[in-house]
């Protein structure tokens, strides 16, 4: 977890119970599901797929994240909100000023769950390459300024507490350095946990989308920039789950935002192929 996560937990203990976190978590679920639904609707234009994926999202959080209050669950609204924003941006439907919100979401999400930085870094690199290829130099520079401004809005509050509490070096070492240098979160048997987590990832069905997205990534495929971000984020994040040396299923929650969107694309492909076969049979 990050600074905002521990701040929320501390406030809950100050108020006497972690039950105070439940309304915040329900709000997080609602916002996450809403952004996920909008993203899937944009990519597939099918309400039934968007609804199904949203239901799977809530079921997955209820099973893999049983008990709740995990950092990634509070970070998901920011991650899925950014995915929806980038989907619209690469489709030409977002204004450059909206990158202030993207910068805000990126910093806030990372301060709830540091490992979401994988997604934020990959998305920033993709935005840079996209602007470079399309020669949007002035727009790219303006977007950077907007992102920095959005970052500052969040970092100012965070740094105020960190500096006043004199925990700067401890925070950097324990939250940032540790999360990206230590894959293991527990000390269970490596091979057993690797087999267990591999089976859990396979059983979750989240690999389906990642393994069937090739036709969405090349040529003139729609929204291919954000799909590359999702696939790479999925791959890098799933490594953390597989090598966590933990029997906890909650580690798979980190791949849910990316895996479900990719799975929605796979479902859309399956429906289209089925419709083509039906149409072909009717002609014959």
Roles of regions detected by a PLM:
Residues 1-16, 26, 109:
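Short hydrophobic/aromatic helix or loop-helix immediately within or flanking a transmembrane segment
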Residues 118, 244-279:
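Hydrophobic/aromatic-rich transmembrane helices and adjacent perimembrane loops
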Residues 44, 80-101, 133, 210-222, ...:
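Membrane-interface transmembrane helices that cradle and orient dolichyl/undecaprenyl
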Residues 119-152, 217, 261, 273:
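Perimembrane helix-loop-helix junctions
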Residues 65-75:
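Short acidic/glycine- and proline-prone juxtamembrane loop motifs at membrane-interface regions
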Residues 85-108, 137, 142, 146, ...:
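Short hydrophobic alpha-helices at membrane interfaces in multi-pass membrane enzymes
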Residues 97-114, 120, 125, 234-243:
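Membrane-interface alpha helices of multi-pass inner-membrane proteins
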Residues 27, 33-60, 76-77:
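Transmembrane-helix signature of polytopic, membrane-embedded enzymes
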